Every structure is written in C-alpha cells, then in structure tokens.
Regions:
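Mg2+-dependent endonuclease catalytic cores in nucleic-acid-processing enzymes, primarily RNase H-like
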Residues: 1-116, 158-169
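Charge-patterned, long linear interaction tracts outside catalytic cores
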Residues: 96-157
Length: 169
C-alpha cells in the first residue's frame, strides 16, 4: 500500500478536493470515511458531501457521548476500538510518528468507574506535537459499522476501469 496520505495546513476546500480525488482514484474504495467535524473539519465534511460523497462521508465528533457506557467519552471509545482491532490483527503501515503517538496514550478510571483516555494536551506535552496521525487512525473506529453490500451490477459499474472493444474477449 501507499501508507498514509495527509495534508498539513490546507484550507477546507483544498482538503475536500484532495480527499475526493484520492477517493475517486482508489481502485478499492472504503465503504465509509469519518470526518472530524469539530472546528474546521465540519467545512471539509460539508464540501465532500456536496461533491457527491454523502453516502460515504460520515460525521464524527469525538467529544460526543460514548456508545458503550464504560467509556468516559467517544474519543476513549475510538481508541479502545482501535486497540481491540490491533489485538485482532489490524495492520497499518509502519510509521514512527504514529507509533510514538499511540504509545504516549494512557488511561485512568474516573470516580464512577469509567475508562478515560488521557487528554490531547497531555499527549502534546509528552511528545511535543499534536497526535494527528493516531487521531486519524482512531477516527476510523468512531463507529464499528458493517461492510456495505454491493449488488453484482453495482460492483462491476464501480470498478470498471476501461471500455473493452467488442470481441476483445
């Protein structure tokens, strides 16, 4: 694979355009793409939907309440889902920054017994930068959704790469 693709400090329109280009260029397309809709990410999400990917783009807000009540918030739940997937064999291309960010995360228990991930500010203090890569990977586990089911005709239409002349086969 290509590893991680990222863009630093781009405006929302450029980021949305770059995402849409990468999605359309991909031979195997993801069923879903979660967008961090806190702050400027909301504009990227809106534009990606306007560009026709509203069936793929899903809004994600890590400050929301967790689906599972054992977690303090959705951010904690996302990172737990990621850790669980890694234990089950989930693989990402090796990336030194991602490894550093993931290893910097710690957790504690709240007085009412909920699992709480350390704050983003604590991570920034520990590693000297924002944990952008680990947040992006964890965001893919915002919700555990089933794979999309495709009809055979939809699959062929989606993945057809060129027009084959009549009689070529």
């Amino acid at each position: 694979g290509r590893g991680f693709i990222g863009w630093e400090k781009k405006d929302t329109m450029e980021t949305a355009s770059k995402f849409t280009y990468e999605y359309n260029a991909a031979y195997i397309k993801p069923d879903y793409a979660f967008f961090d809709t806190i702050g400027v990410g909301a504009g990227v999400f809106d534009r990606v939907c306007q560009l026709g990917l509203d069936q793929v783009a899903l809004e994600a807000n890590a400050s929301k309440k967790a689906t599972n009540p054992i977690y303090f918030n959705k951010r904690t739940e996302m990172y737990h889902n990621l850790a669980d997937a890694v234990k089950k064999g989930f693989y990402t291309p090796y990336d030194e920054e991602l490894e550093e960010e993931l290893l910097a995360h710690t957790y504690s228990l709240t007085p009412d017994g909920k699992i709480k991930l350390c704050s983003k500010d604590e991570i920034k203090e520990a590693i000297g930068r924002s944990p952008d890569k680990s947040d992006a990977v964890a965001l893919t586990f915002f919700e555990l959704l089933p794979a999309q089911s495709y009809k055979k005709d939809d699959f062929a239409q989606t993945y057809q790469q060129s027009n084959i002349p009549s009689g070529a086969w």
